[in-house]
Amino acid sequence: MSKKNSTPLISAVNLTCIREERLLFDELSLQINAGDIVQVEGPNGSGKTSLLRILSGLSQPYDGQILYREQLISHCREEFHQNLLYFGHLSGVKGEMTAEENLDFNLALHGNKTQESLSYLAKVNLSGFEECLASHLSAGQHRRIALARLYQSNVPIWILDEPFTAIDKQGVASLERLFSLHAERGGCVILTTHQDLISIKPEQIKKITLDYSYDSAVD
């Protein structure tokens, strides 16, 4: 991972988002730099997941642009996605593989076969489930397998939608420490959560609040 520099990792310029004829946010601009931990806040339905999907290039805004290192992501999509880890509501876990095999598969995809998957599963409270087929595990356990990939990841941009769901207090604290370390190494973390980030220094956290004051229908 590269060291911190003055070029923003992600820039959003005048984003407008409309879903089901509702205006969620309008002319939203932001810059996310290496070292940033950005917490997106707002009530349910305010557009938090929509914003994360737009920032990750998985959804298109009604208007506005997303840039990666000052280039439109449409011009560098492959490079952008190689430097992005997105954690959404779908885990991406393969049911025909065990929990350990899912992590080994992820390591193999990224050209790194030397790290120990068992220790990562322990960090997300899945010790004892290493040899269980993922198809026999719960949805919450699938999310924990997906979260274990964070401990394997060297990509700079992490975009995480409610990463603390189904994680106990010890696991949350461990993830928060990981986020701080990732930021200190020159990465960035963009996440939604209703929890306070108590293990992260307040000066490390930037907050974006989505809370449109009226339910605006679009003609």
UniProtKB/Swiss-Prot annotation:
Q: Which Pfam families match?
A: ABC_tran
Q: Which residues cross the membrane?
A: none
Alphabetized InterPro entries for the sequence = AAA+_ATPase (IPR003593), ABC_transporter-like_ATP-bd (IPR003439), ABC_transptr_haem_export_CcmA (IPR005895), P-loop_NTPase (IPR027417)
Q: Which SMART domains match?
A: AAA
- Enumerate the spans annotated as ABC transporter domain: 10-218
Amino-acid positions noted as binding ATP in the UniProt annotation, renumbered to this chain: 42-49
Name the PROSITE patterns on file.
Answer: ABC_TRANSPORTER_2, CCMA
Subcellular location(s): the record lists: Cell inner membrane
- NCBIfam families in alphabetical order: ccmA (TIGR01189), PRK13538.1 (NF010061)
Q: Tell me, how does this one assemble? A: The complex is composed of two ATP-binding proteins (CcmA) and two transmembrane proteins (CcmB).
Report the family membership. Answer: Belongs to the ABC transporter superfamily. CcmA exporter (TC 3.A.1.107) family.
Which protein, by its recorded name, is this?
Answer: Cytochrome c biogenesis ATP-binding export protein CcmA
- Its source organism is Colwellia psychrerythraea (strain 34H / ATCC BAA-681) (Vibrio psychroerythus)
